[in-house]
C-alpha cells in the first residue's frame, strides 16, 4: 500500500495568527455613588463581566470596596491626606449605592506628623453606634510646647500620657455611641472629635495634631434597603450631597 499525503487534511498556513478578541467587549460599566453625607456623590466607574446565564453581574458587585480620596468627595484640597473606603451595598440599574466602610490617613501624612522632641499618644477603642455598626476608632496626638517653656523637648511623663489616653477613649466612646454611622461621618470630616479631645485635655497636657487616624468597620447590622435609600436621598440621581460645615452640631429635637 502506497503511503502519501492525505489531501483531505487541511494544513495550517504559516504566519496565520489567532483572532484577538478585546476582553472589554464582555464587560459593562457601572457608576459608583457615594452617600449624600459627602458633597460630591459621583465617585467614578467600575466594570464587571456581563450577566450570562445563571451568573448575575449584580452578585459580583455587591460587597465590592472602593478607596477614594476625601478631597475628591468634598471638592477641597484640605482633605487630600485622608482616604475613605466605600462598600457597594445595592445595585440600581447602572448605579451602585455605597455606604461608609472606613477612613484612614495617607502614609506620607502620618510620617510628617512624627517628629523629634515630642511624645506620641495613641488610643483605640471598639464602639457600637446607635444603628448597631461596630467600629474600631484609632486616635493620635502629640505633645507641644507651652507658652513660657524654655526647655527644648516636650516629653511627657507616663502617668500624664495614661491620663490623656483615658480621656481620649472616654470622648471617642461618648461621641460615637450616641450617633448613627451617617452622623459619625459628618463628625469625622471636620475633625469634631479631635477638637473635643484637645479641649478636654488642656488641663492635663497641651496637645497638637490631634486626629482620628483611622476608623475600621468590624461588624454591620442586617442589610436594610430603606435605610440605604434614605442615606442616598431616596435613590435620587443628584450628583451633589449635603455640605458638612466645620462647626458640626448634633440635631436636638425640641420636646413636644
From Swiss-Prot:
One of its GO terms (molecular function) is structural constituent of ribosome. Disulfide bonds: none annotated. The modification N-acetylalanine is found at residue 2. It is found in: Cytoplasm. It comes from the Eukaryota. Keywords: Acetylation, Cytoplasm, Ribonucleoprotein, Ribosomal protein. PROSITE patterns: RIBOSOMAL_S3AE (PS01191). One of its GO terms (cellular component) is cytosolic small ribosomal subunit. Pfam families: Ribosomal_S3Ae (PF01015). Transmembrane segments: none annotated. GO terms for biological process: translation. Belongs to the eukaryotic ribosomal protein eS1 family. Component of the small ribosomal subunit. Mature ribosomes consist of a small (40S) and a large (60S) subunit. The 40S subunit contains about 33 different proteins and 1 molecule of RNA (18S). The 60S subunit contains about 49 different proteins and 3 molecules of RNA (25S, 5.8S and 5S). This is Small ribosomal subunit protein eS1B. It comes from Debaryomyces hansenii (strain ATCC 36239 / CBS 767 / BCRC 21394 / JCM 1990 / NBRC 0083 / IGC 2968) (Yeast). The gene is RPS1B.
Amino acid at each position: 500500500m502506497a503511503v502519501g499525503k492525505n489531501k483531505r487534511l487541511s494544513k495550517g498556513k504559516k504566519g496565520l495568527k489567532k483572532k484577538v478578541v478585546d476582553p472589554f467587549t464582555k464587560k459593562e460599566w457601572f457608576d459608583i455613588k457615594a452617600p449624600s453625607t459627602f458633597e460630591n456623590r459621583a465617585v467614578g466607574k467600575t466594570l464587571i463581566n456581563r450577566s450570562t446565564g445563571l451568573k448575575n453581574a449584580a452578585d459580583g458587585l455587591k460587597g465590592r470596596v472602593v478607596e477614594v480620596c476625601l478631597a475628591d468627595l468634598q471638592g477641597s484640597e484640605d482633605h487630600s491626606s485622608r482616604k475613605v473606603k466605600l462598600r457597594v451595598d445595592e445595585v440600581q440599574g447602572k448605579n451602585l449605592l455605597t455606604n461608609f466602610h472606613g477612613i484612614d490617613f495617607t502614609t506620607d501624612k502620618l510620617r510628617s506628623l512624627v517628629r523629634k522632641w515630642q511624645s506620641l499618644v495613641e488610643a483605640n477603642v471598639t464602639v457600637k453606634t446607635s444603628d448597631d455598626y461596630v467600629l474600631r476608632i484609632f486616635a493620635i496626638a502629640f505633645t507641644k510646647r507651652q507658652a513660657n517653656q524654655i526647655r527644648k523637648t516636650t516629653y511627657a511623663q507616663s502617668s500624664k500620657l495614661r491620663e490623656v489616653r483615658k480621656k481620649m477613649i472616654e470622648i471617642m466612646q461618648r461621641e460615637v455611641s450616641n450617633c448613627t454611622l451617617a452622623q459619625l461621618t459628618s463628625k469625622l470630616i471636620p475633625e469634631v472629635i479631635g477638637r473635643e479631645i484637645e479641649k478636654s485635655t488642656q488641663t492635663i497636657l497641651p496637645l497638637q495634631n490631634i486626629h482620628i487616624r483611622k476608623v475600621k468597620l468590624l461588624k454591620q447590622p442586617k442589610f436594610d434597603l430603606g435605610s440605604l435609600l434614605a442615606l442616598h436621598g431616596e435613590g435620587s440621581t443628584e450628583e451633589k450631597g449635603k455640605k458638612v460645615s466645620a462647626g458640626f452640631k448634633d440635631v436636638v429635637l425640641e420636646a413636644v
